[in-house]
């Protein structure tokens, strides 16, 4: 397994968005089977991509750990893009970028819904963040940008032209169940995202300090926690539901991944593990039985 680092290599954003543009047509076809909200669900994470340097290896790993299946597609120019499914539920996409000059780019990247991506990018810049790429048009999907927030955490922005996945789709094992920012300044980060996407902030007192939840349309959209040590760069952590977190964590190690934080009663009642896949992408496993 590769060593992982939570760093930003801006060059790979350009490649990612070019791939998304090329493969937006097959994604558009698949969206026709998803219940979509008539209104924009600003602040909601509405899509995720795994950027990896070895799609075949990543497919094997996630098939064993999360039970995923896949559909390989190609867009204009023959660029490959893999759609990820948990049962019949479309979960995310997967793209391969194997460029030795762009180290440490393997990661999960989430996209937040915004009403107007151009205005959102202007806001990001006004608060000390940056737009690494975009906004760009994604045929049949909408407009997207990839940004670094003021603390340099990477996230995508998506202004959907077809509607956002409706909140009636319940979380379940195998799909994304939560998104969490590990932050160097949780209060500042919460204010930034709340202002960017029109969200409310709810503060919860927890054993390790204040946990901030971002809400919009009456729904919890994401959480923000202080980073445990100063040597961790701020980053968004994607949580995937599993039936048994201890079993899933054991599968991670059996399939060549690494468990950074195993399930423990001292941390969120043992319901969560933080792991790294064999290519170096960090993610969380969350026990989800609802």
Where are the model-predicted features located?
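Intrinsically disordered, glycine/charged-rich N-terminal periplasmic/extracytoplasmic linker segments
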Residues: 76-126, 132-133, 138, 224
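Vicinal oxygen chelate
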Residues: 4, 23-40, 44-53, 83, 100-123, 128-177, ...
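Short hydrophobic transmembrane-like helices used for membrane targeting/insertion
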Residues: 6-8
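Residue-level hotspots at or immediately adjacent to binding/recognition sites across diverse folds
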Residues: 33, 39, 53-55, 115
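Bacterial N-terminal signal peptides
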Residues: 10-21
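Core segments of cupin and vicinal oxygen chelate
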Residues: 28-30, 49-89, 126, 134-142, ...
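Residues that act as N-cap/strand-start positions at coil-to-secondary-structure junctions
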Residues: 78, 106, 208, 234, ...
């Amino acid at each position: 397994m590769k060593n992982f680092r939570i760093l930003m290599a801006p060059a790979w954003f350009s490649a990612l968005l070019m791939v998304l543009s090329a493969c937006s047509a097959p994604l558009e076809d698949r969206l026709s089977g998803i219940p979509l909200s008539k209104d924009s669900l600003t602040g909601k994470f509405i899509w995720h991509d795994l950027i990896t340097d070895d799609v075949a290896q990543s497919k094997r790993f996630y098939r064993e750990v999360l039970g995923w299946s896949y559909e390989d597609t190609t867009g204009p120019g023959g660029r490959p893009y893999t759609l990820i499914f948990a049962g019949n539920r479309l979960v995310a996409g997967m793209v391969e970028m194997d460029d030795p000059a762009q180290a440490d780019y393997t990661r999960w990247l989430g996209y937040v819904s915004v009403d107007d991506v151009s205005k959102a990018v202007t806001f990001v810049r006004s608060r000390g963040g940056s737009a690494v790429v975009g906004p760009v048009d994604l045929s049949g999907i909408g407009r997207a940008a990839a940004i670094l927030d003021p603390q340099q955490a990477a996230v995508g922005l998506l202004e959907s032209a077809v509607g956002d996945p409706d909140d009636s789709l319940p979380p379940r094992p195998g799909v994304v169940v939560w998104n969490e920012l590990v932050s160097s300044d949780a209060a500042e980060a919460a204010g930034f995202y709340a202002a960017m996407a029109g969200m409310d902030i709810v503060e919860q007192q927890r054993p390790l300090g204040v946990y901030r939840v971002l809400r919009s349309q009456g729904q919890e959209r994401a959480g923000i926690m202080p980073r445990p040590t100063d040597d961790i760069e701020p980053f968004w952590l994607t949580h995937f539901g599993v039936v048994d977190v201890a079993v899933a964590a054991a599968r991670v190690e059996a399939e060549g991944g690494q468990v950074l934080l195993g399930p423990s009663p001292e941390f969120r009642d043992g319901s969560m593990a933080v792991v790294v896949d064999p290519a170096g992408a960090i993610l969380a496993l969350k026990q989800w039985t609802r």
